[in-house]
Amino acid sequence: MANSKSAKKRALQSEKRRQHNASRRSMLRTYVKKVIAAIKAGDHKTATEAFAVAQPIVDRMATKGLIHKNKAARQKARLNAKIKAIAA
């Protein structure tokens, strides 16, 4: 338990940040899942549109520090490769 005034404040800030990050992480996963669902359905047009929406969000979360920039790059590359595979 926080004993000092500053420790109590840090605990409150930490909890607030945790909730904010959880919300952002959930949003990110939702957009990525939409792309994956379109890929599994075999719908190239919908998958491409969903990817176009998800891509800047993945980049933004990497910039904000929610995910590592390499993870963002890897995620985008894998999704794009799967979209190209269903087009062929």
Swiss-Prot record:
GO cellular component: cytosol; small ribosomal subunit
Region (Disordered): 1-27
InterPro entries in the record: Ribosomal_bS20, Ribosomal_bS20_sf
GO biological process: translation
One Gene Ontology term of the molecular function aspect: small ribosomal subunit rRNA binding
SUPFAM superfamilies named among the record's database cross-references: Ribosomal protein S20
Pfam families: Ribosomal_S20p
Protein origin, superkingdom: Bacteria
Alphabetical list of Gene3D superfamilies matching this protein: Ribosomal protein S20
Keywords: Ribonucleoprotein, Ribosomal protein, RNA-binding, rRNA-binding
NCBIfam families, alphabetized: S20
Family as reported in the entry's similarity comment: Belongs to the bacterial ribosomal protein bS20 family.
Function: Binds directly to 16S ribosomal RNA.
Protein name: Small ribosomal subunit protein bS20
